[in-house]
């Protein structure tokens, strides 16, 4: 019964569905609007606001099988994965939840009946822990469920503070909390370990399988515990642990899901030892990596993307350890989909993107992996002691892309630890250097702390009156300004848009009778809007009323570029995949720049399709609407939220027909048709996994097209062709050029052969070897190599030194016949000559080349060659 993990998952959800629970799909591994979490790490995460009373659902009972990741941040199991029986970066948490519905009696009964009646686990193999003072739970377990008192264990405050216990759960320092009951399974006395609460509890005999949390208190900042008006229940059972029990194995890595992945990895890599720990690491890591990418996380150098990159690179390193010579990790995705069953729905839809992303990241890391491992191996071999210094760990991170935990993983296998504190010092020093390099001129206005609040009226008007509430000059508050002075002016109300969300601040004028202030930029300072600029005429004081006039032309052009970024974002997601997310943008009156997550360069045909789709949406002339609503409403409407942006409870939703809907506080056109034309001017990578598109719109796009056409016409004129046949004519010219280059090369070879016959006669005898040292005139540098080969053949046994002097340039080549390389090394000789003419070079013992920048010193350098050779050929 329930021999597969998929069958067990279905049985759990069906059991609770028949007991009145709403089956809720697993939420994304990326927590929505919860800045406290890096990844979803528990079943209750998606119900957090329900427990806090901030969200209402249509149900009061729920059940789910939640995908979870623990890697990075506070909850980090990465270092232990592969080395223990139960640590994972990815796991599924089965759970049932009550939101003010049932409480202890029903929760305990549901859990016990599922384990003993549905799964038919022997009751004598189960024991239960409760919080020391939870007499209510004790009575339910013993008197109603019938668990013997000796199988019930009270756990007190074992973590050094009141209510700090393995059996007392709390969401944070304040808020909902309460005691919990944990059910343990006894794997048998053949495995070392003791019952919970004993000195041997960390052994593997007694394994926690289900935690039932009773949220019955609201903890105050004072520490006081106030009873909740509606107590709730949150439970969690790791599917891997219960699957191990049902499948009669002890380690999670022995269950069906992991065994399928382990065997597939072994098959791909040609490994026969299925107990190898590296196979465990890889089989675990493919689960977290694949599902993270499916949920929109892409490998990068920051935040969630960097955690993903660390996990992928750890898996790739273990594959390398097993002998992998090419990309293998992405090949596990089909097997993962097969064994995950219903839990793989989101993965099926994104399979192609997941595989491409994994392969691209693996190939990128493979370029530096071998060299980095060689440097690490050398450092460990020379190590005196058992601690690798932080500087070396940082070099591996900075130069070869080795996350510090990957370095620690390699060291661990040799019983060596990494000085992680030293690593952090080196990292901090690099940050300081980067910050220092980026600081040129100090702008005191950038760090202003302004308490005032400004009302923004610029969505509906570009001219309005505002009262001066504050003035800042050189970072200091002042009461007045005179002509010629630079300052930041804060108004109580303004139509000027302060830079935010990638949109640059407005420019324009602040005026009054006899007064003009030139606004060169507008910035936000908390709730205030600051107008940065210069007083052109008159004087301004706090309390004055000014007319605020936004530059309409600049604002309009900026709006074109901002609106089209929404269309571009939607087009990229539609054509490249939903993994595409905005990573940054810059929108001003001249152009737009849009950064987005993608694992490879955008192909020309894809870029054209994106541009065409955006222009199609422009021609459809969608009406734009901007509506303010609460965050939940926005989510229900499918609005795109941008990662890294902070949103308030009320958000502004910008909609463009049925094509784009995003949260945005910026200013936009009235209809997409106002944009006119969209032209992409460039696409490229700015970081691993992050691409950048630059583009223009409207009149700027027309000017760009006109410039391209003018360039095409100029090329046509040079080729003596019409603009429609430029490519054909150019291809013919290139083919002709290749043919001429081939003929030229053949002529040079003939010339070299003829020249070599003449030059060979100029060779001198030096201790039985022929030596030719010659500065050549009228010979192309490209012919030197062939010429020295010809001369070596003609000399039979000898040394050839040839040089060409040009304007501020020297070309050198040295050839040595193989019978003389024990005495004369070509690389050593050419380096000696090059050093005298302001250059350097090197090569093989029988042939080496070099360059220099001081041709005036060449004759003197060549005069030194003969004595150098006489000494070595003696």
Curated annotation (Swiss-Prot):
GO cellular component labels: cytosol
GO molecular function ontology, one term from the record: zinc ion binding
Coiled coil residues, start to end: none
Catalytic reaction(s) noted: tRNA(Ala) + L-alanine + ATP = L-alanyl-tRNA(Ala) + AMP + diphosphate
Subcellular compartments: Cytoplasm
SMART domains with a match to the protein in the record: tRNA_SAD (SM00863)
Keyword flag RNA-binding: yes
E.C. number: 6.1.1.7
Pfam families: DHHA1, tRNA-synt_2c, tRNA_SAD
InterPro entries reported for this sequence: aa-tRNA-synth_II/BPL/LPL, Ala-tRNA-lgiase_IIc, Ala-tRNA-ligase_IIc_anticod-bd, Ala-tRNA-synth_IIc_core, Ala-tRNA-synth_IIc_N, Ala-tRNA_ligase, Ala_tRNA_ligase_euk/bac, DHHA1_dom
Signal peptide range in chain numbering: none
Keywords from the UniProt entry: Aminoacyl-tRNA synthetase, ATP-binding, Cytoplasm, Ligase, Metal-binding, Nucleotide-binding, Protein biosynthesis, RNA-binding, tRNA-binding, Zinc
Cofactor list: Zn(2+)
Manner of cofactor binding, per the entry note: Binds 1 zinc ion per subunit.
GO process terms (BP): alanyl-tRNA aminoacylation; negative regulation of DNA-templated transcription
Disulfide bridges in this chain: none
Main location: cytoplasm
Binding, Zn(2+): 562, 566, 664, 668
PROSITE patterns: AA_TRNA_LIGASE_II_ALA
Function, as annotated: Catalyzes the attachment of alanine to tRNA(Ala) in a two-step reaction: alanine is first activated by ATP to form Ala-AMP and then transferred to the acceptor end of tRNA(Ala). Also edits incorrectly charged Ser-tRNA(Ala) and Gly-tRNA(Ala) via its editing domain.
HAMAP family in the cross-refs: Ala_tRNA_synth_B
Family named by the database record: Belongs to the class-II aminoacyl-tRNA synthetase family.
Domain comment quoted from the record: Consists of three domains; the N-terminal catalytic domain, the editing domain and the C-terminal C-Ala domain. The editing domain removes incorrectly charged amino acids, while the C-Ala domain, along with tRNA(Ala), serves as a bridge to cooperatively bring together the editing and aminoacylation centers thus stimulating deacylation of misacylated tRNAs.
PANTHER family to which the protein is assigned, alphabetical: ALANINE--TRNA LIGASE, CYTOPLASMIC, ALANYL-TRNA SYNTHETASE
Descriptive protein name: Alanine--tRNA ligase
Source species of the chain: Shewanella woodyi (strain ATCC 51908 / MS32)
């Amino acid at each position: 019964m329930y021999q597969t993990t998929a069958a067990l998952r279905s049985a759990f959800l069906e059991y609770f569905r028949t007991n009145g629970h709403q089956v809720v799909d697993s939420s994304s591994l990326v927590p929505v609007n919860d800045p406290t979490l890096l990844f979803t790490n528990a079943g209750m995460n998606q119900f957090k606001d329900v427990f806090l009373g901030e969200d209402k659902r249509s149900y009061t009972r729920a059940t789910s099988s939640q995908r979870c990741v623990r890697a990075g941040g506070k909850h980090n199991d990465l270092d232990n994965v592969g080395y223990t029986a139960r640590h994972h970066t990815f796991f599924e948490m089965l759970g049932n939840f009550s939101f003010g519905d049932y409480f202890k009696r029903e929760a305990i009964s549901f859990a016990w009946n599922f384990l003993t009646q549905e799964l038919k686990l022997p009751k004598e193999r189960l024991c239960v822990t409760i919080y020391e003072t939870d007499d209510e739970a004790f009575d339910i377990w013993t008197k109603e469920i019938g668990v013997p008192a000796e199988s019930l264990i009270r756990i007190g405050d074992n973590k050094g503070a009141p209510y700090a216990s393995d059996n007392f759960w709390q969401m944070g320092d304040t808020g909902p909390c309460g005691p919990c009951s944990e059910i343990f399974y006894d794997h048998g006395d053949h495995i070392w370990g003791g019952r919970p609460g004993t000195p041997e509890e960390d052994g593997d005999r007694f394994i926690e399988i289900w935690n039932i949390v009773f949220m019955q208190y609201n903890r105050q900042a004072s520490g006081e515990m106030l009873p909740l008006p509606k107590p709730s229940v949150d439970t969690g059972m790791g599917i891997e642990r219960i699957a191990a029990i049902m499948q009669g194995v002890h380690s999670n890595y022995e269950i069906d899901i992991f065994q399928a992945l382990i065997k597939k990895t072994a098959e791909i890599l040609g490994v026969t030892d299925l107990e190898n720990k590296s196979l465990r690491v890889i089989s675990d890591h493919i689960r977290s990596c694949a599902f993270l990418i499916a949920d929109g996380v892409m490998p990068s150098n920051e935040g969630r993307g960097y955690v993903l990159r660390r996990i992928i690179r750890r898996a790739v390193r273990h594959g390398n350890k097993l002998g992998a010579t090419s990309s293998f990790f992405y090949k596990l995705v089909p097997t993962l989909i097969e064994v995950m069953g219903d839990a793989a729905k989101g993965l099926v839809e994104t399979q192609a993107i997941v595989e491409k992303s994994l392969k691209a990241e693996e190939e990128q890391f493979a370029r530096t992996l071998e060299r980095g491992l060689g440097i690490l191996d050398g450092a460990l071999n020379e190590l005196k002691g058992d601690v690798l210094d932080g500087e070396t760990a940082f070099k591996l991170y900075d130069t070869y892309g080795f996350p510090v935990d990957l370095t620690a993983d390699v060291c661990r296998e040799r019983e060596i630890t990494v000085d992680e504190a030293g690593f952090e010092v080196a990292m901090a020093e690099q940050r300081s250097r980067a910050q220092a390099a980026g600081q040129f001129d100090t702008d005191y206005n950038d760090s202003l702390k302004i308490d005032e609040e400004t009302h923004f009226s610029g969505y509906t008007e570009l001219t309005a009156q505002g009262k001066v509430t504050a003035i800042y000059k050189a970072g200091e508050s002042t009461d007045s300004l005179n002509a010629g002075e630079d300052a930041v002016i804060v108004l109580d109300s303004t139509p000027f848009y302060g830079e935010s969300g990638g949109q640059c601040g407005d420019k324009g004028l602040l005026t009054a009778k006899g007064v003009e202030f030139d606004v060169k930029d507008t910035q936000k300072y908390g709730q205030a809007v600051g107008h940065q600029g210069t007083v052109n005429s008159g004087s301004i004081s706090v309390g004055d009323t000014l007319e605020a006039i936004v530059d309409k032309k600049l604002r309009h052009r900026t709006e074109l570029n901002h609106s089209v970024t929404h269309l571009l974002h939607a087009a990229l997601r539609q054509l490249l995949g939903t993994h595409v997310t905005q990573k940054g943008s810059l929108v001003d009156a001249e152009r737009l720049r849009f950064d987005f997550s993608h694992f490879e360069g955008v192909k020309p045909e894809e870029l054209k399709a994106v541009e065409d789709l955006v222009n199609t949406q422009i021609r459809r002339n969608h009406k734009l609407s901007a509506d303010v609503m609460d965050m939940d409403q926005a989510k229900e409407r499918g609005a795109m939220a941008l990662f890294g942006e902070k949103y308030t409870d009320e958000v502004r939703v910008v909609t463009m027909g049925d094509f784009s809907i995003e949260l945005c506080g910026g200013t936009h056109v009235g209809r997409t048709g106002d944009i006119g034309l969209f032209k992409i001017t460039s696409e490229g990578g700015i970081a691993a996994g992050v691409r950048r598109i630059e583009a223009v719109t409207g009149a700027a796009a027309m000017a760009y097209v006109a410039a391209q056409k003018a360039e095409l016409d100029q090329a046509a004129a040079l080729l003596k062709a019409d603009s429609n046949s430029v490519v054909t004519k150019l291809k013919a010219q290139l083919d002709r050029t290749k043919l001429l280059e081939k003929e030229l090369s053949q002529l040079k070879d003939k010339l070299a052969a003829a020249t070599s016959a003449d030059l060979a006669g100029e060779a001198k005898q030096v201790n039985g070897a022929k030596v030719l040292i010659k500065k050549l005139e009228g010979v192309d540098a490209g012919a030197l190599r062939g010429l020295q080969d010809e001369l070596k053949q003609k000399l039979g046994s000898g040394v050839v030194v040839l040089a060409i002097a040009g304007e501020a340039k020297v070309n050198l080549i040295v050839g040595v016949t193989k019978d003389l390389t024990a005495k004369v090394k070509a690389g050593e000789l050419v380096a000696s000559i090059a050093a005298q003419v302001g250059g350097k070079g090197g090569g093989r013992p029988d042939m080496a080349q070099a360059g220099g920048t001081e041709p005036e010193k060449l004759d003197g350098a060549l005069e030194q060659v003969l004595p150098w050779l006489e000494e070595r050929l003696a």
